Amino acid sequence: MMTLSSMPVTHRADAKSGHSFDANRHWAASLTLGFCAQNSGDTRVTRMNIARHYGPLRVQRPFYPEGKDGCCHVYLLHPPGGVVSGDALNIDISLTKGAHSLITTPAANKLYKADSNGVAWSQTTNLKVDDNATLEWLPQETLAFDGSRGVQVFNIELAKTAKCLGWEILGLGRPASDLPFATGCIEQRFKLTQDGKPLWLERQNLDPTHPRFNGKWGQGGATVHGTFWTVGLSDPTAAIAALREQLPPSNNWAATYRRDVLLVRYLGHERNQVWKLFEQVRNILRPLLSGHQATIPRIWLT
């Protein structure tokens, strides 16, 4: 039986969340989504059977642009439009056996400058995918304003036969307005496990005052960073070959495959360049991963 709920989620942090603007300011928000595959006549349909929120995190109703028995598209909404000092956002998404969901956002996420107390923000995303389920995590880019301070944590937990592809794109500063990311610090942590085994563990500190930020041996002064991951390919060698054959050659991207994880990395200065690149990567890899051609979420066209 499907149980769809929009009731707020209760967290221990709730009691500490409120209208405080000093060094202890804390504004909590959370969103919990669950997807399951259900029989509908002679087909299997992915339904969103859990939807709970606390604070300003919401979700629109599911869309099925690929047909009733196709991938379930869902748009995450954060009405404030950005993250400020003291914000603590937590997103939990889980897919049970056989489900197929695509999660995206309607606009770029913004990480604003820290307040006068230097209070940091936090974002935690937990993705859990069961056997024979497929999750596509495709948010629009994140833009970090100069002086922003915070931590982004991504935890991806896959069952043995689960499949997952996704990306994260981060733009630093506002170069078009001559406002570089010159102060502040953003820490990113990635953890991907499958069947309980760690496959990809990563931590990077984006500190513009550290030599690594501009050094050729580090980030090389890149203002746009992108990571595309894929797990569950039946023929990764063919996938790598297809990427290298079909993607335009550039010093800004590279592809690797280790421990069952295919990664495409981008370091550069153009949001549109990485977006176009990652769309091409998805167009190549999605059919190999799921057997279905890539479709563009309608929200990207508005």
Swiss-Prot record:
Check the record and name the Pfam families matching this protein: UreD
Give me the Gene Ontology terms describing cellular component.
cytoplasm
Quaternary organization: UreD, UreF and UreG form a complex that acts as a GTP-hydrolysis-dependent molecular chaperone, activating the urease apoprotein by helping to assemble the nickel containing metallocenter of UreC. The UreE protein probably delivers the nickel.
Q: What compartments host this protein?
A: Cytoplasm
Q: What does this protein do?
A: Required for maturation of urease via the functional incorporation of the urease nickel metallocenter.
Entry protein name? Urease accessory protein UreD
Molecular function via GO: nickel cation binding
Q: Which organism is it from?
A: Pseudoalteromonas translucida (strain TAC 125)
Q: Which family does it belong to?
A: Belongs to the UreD family.
Keywords tagged on the record: Chaperone, Cytoplasm, Nickel insertion
